[in-house]
C-alpha cells in the first residue's frame, strides 16, 4: 500500500504555488498600453510566467477570459486646411477647437477600453483565486485520505502482528515451564517498578511538607496584611461616616435656609373646550436674574363687577400680586415639579418627617400633580410614583455605606371626618371602623386601626397600591369636575433605616396628601337630593382645611395649644407637622377667569402659610 501511495505523493508536488498569483505585474503593462495608442496592447500579450507550475493556472484563466483585443487608437482625422493668415484668428480658433474635440473623443475611447480591460483582469483574478481555494481544499482532502490510509496500514500491521503472536502462543503451549519462568521475571520487574514508585511518592511527600511549611508562613504574612487592610478599612469607614454625617447636617441646613415650610404654586393649563383667558389675566414676572431665573411671583387681575354696575362704566381691573418659593406656569412639566422636591427624599431617609400637600379648588390639578394620569406615560407620572422611584434608588445607593432601609406603606382617605382604608380588598372592605390611635401606650406614634400596612420594596409594588387606592377613592360629580375627589387622601410611607455596624437607627414618616377640592358654598343654591350630600361634603372639607390653617398658624405663633384634634386630618398628621418636620404645600389654581374668586382664596391661604415659620426640624434618630 505504501508503494501505491508514493506515486500519489509525487504527483501532488509543486501544487502549493498555484494559490499565489502575482496580479501586480498585469497592472503595469495595462496602464502603459493606455498611454501608447499605437501598437498592440499589453493585454493581448498575456501575463508573464512567474512560477514553474502555479502561473500556468493563471495563464489558462487569462486565456479562457478571451480578452478583447484593443484596436490601435486612430489619430484624429481632420483636414489640414492651408495656412490661414495671421489676421484670421477666428478661423485658427475653429481649427484648434476641432482638433481638441478629436483628441477628447480619442481620450474617451481609450478610457472605455481601459475600463473594459480592467474588468476582464478583475474577473480573471477572481477565477484564479477561486481555483486556488479549490486546490487548497483538494490538497486538504488528499492529506486526510493519506492519513486514513496510513492509519489503516498501521492497524493492518497490528492485526498481522497479533495473528502471528497468537499462532506463536498456540505453537508454544507445550513450553509452559519456560512461560512460567518468563512470568516470574515480569513479576520481579513489576516489584522493582513498585519500589521505584514508592520512593517517588516519598520524595513528593517530603516536597509537599516543605511547601506546606512555606505556605503556612505565607498565610501568616497574608493574615498580617489582611489585619492591616481591615484596620485601614475601618478608618476609611469612620471617615466616610463622618463625611456622611456632615453631608446630612449641611443638607438639613440648606433645607432650613430654604424654609421648613415651603409653598409652591402651580397653574394648570387650559383644557380642550375651555375658554382662553384674556391677555394679562395671569402674569408670571421674571426673577432678579431675568428669564433664566425660575419664577417665584404670580400676578392675577380681577374686575370689580359691583362698581361697574353702579357707575355704568367699564369695570376697573384690580391686580393681586403673590410671592411664593416657586411658581410653575401652565407649561411646566411633571419632571420640573419633581426636581424641586427631590431633595426632600434625602431628608426623609435621613430621619426627618416630611409632609407634602396638594391644595386648591376642585379641578385645579391636585390629583394630577400627586398621582399623575393613568395610562403608563412616564412624562405624566405624578409626584408619588416619581418620589417612590427616587426614594428606592437613593436607598439602594446608601446600602453601600452600610445603611439598610425598610418601607411600610398605607393609604387612607378622610371623607366627612371618617377615616377609610383605600387599600382594603375583598372581605376586608367595611370590616370595622378605622380610628386613629396611639401605636403603644405612651408612644407618640399614631396608627390607623383596621387599615392595611403593606411592606414595599420596589416602585412596582407602590404602583399597584396606587392603582387600588384610585379605584376605592370617593369621587362625585361637581360643577367644576366630572369626577371630583370628595375626600382627603393621605399616602403614608414609614421609613426605617439602620446602620448595624454603628448601631444607628432612624425612623421617619413620609406623607403625601391630596387635599379635597376647596370651594365656597353658594348661599342661593337650591338643594336637591344629591346636592345635600355635596353640601355636607363641602362643609366637612372646608372645616378640615380651616383647621389645617389654624394648626399651621398656631405652630408658627408657638402657641401652647395646637388644635390637632379639631380635625381627623390634622390629628393623623400631627407627627409630620410642627418643628420636627419639613412641609411643602402645592397650591393649585385654575387658569380660567370664571374661577378667579376661588383662585384668590387659594392664593391668599397659601400666602399665609408661606409666611409661617415653625422652627428647626430635627431628625428622629435612636
Swiss-Prot record:
Residues 32-41 have a biased composition (Polar residues). One of its GO terms (biological process) is cell division. The keyword Protein biosynthesis does not apply. SUPFAM superfamilies: P-loop containing nucleoside triphosphate hydrolases. InterPro entries: Kinesin-like_fam (IPR027640), Kinesin_motor_CS (IPR019821), Kinesin_motor_dom (IPR001752), Kinesin_motor_dom_sf (IPR036961), P-loop_NTPase (IPR027417). Its main location: nucleus. The keyword Lyase does not apply. One of its GO terms (molecular function) is microtubule motor activity. Gene3D superfamilies: 1.10.287.1490, Kinesin motor domain. Residues 1-88, 279-323 are annotated as: Disordered. PROSITE patterns: KINESIN_MOTOR_1, KINESIN_MOTOR_2. ATP binds at residues 360-367. Residues 95-264 form a coiled coil. Keywords: ATP-binding, Cell cycle, Cell division, Coiled coil, Cytoplasm, Cytoskeleton, Endosome, Microtubule, Mitosis, Motor protein, Nucleotide-binding, Nucleus, Phosphoprotein. CDD domains: KISc_C_terminal (cd01366). PANTHER family: KINESIN-LIKE PROTEIN KLP-3 (PTHR47972), PROTEIN CLARET SEGREGATIONAL (PTHR47972:SF45). Binds NUBP1 and NUBP2. Interacts with PPP1R42. Minus end-directed microtubule-dependent motor required for bipolar spindle formation. May contribute to movement of early endocytic vesicles. Regulates cilium formation and structure. Belongs to the TRAFAC class myosin-kinesin ATPase superfamily. Kinesin family. NCD subfamily. This is Kinesin-like protein KIFC1. It comes from Cricetulus griseus (Chinese hamster). The lineage of its organism: Eukaryota, Metazoa, Chordata, Craniata, Vertebrata.
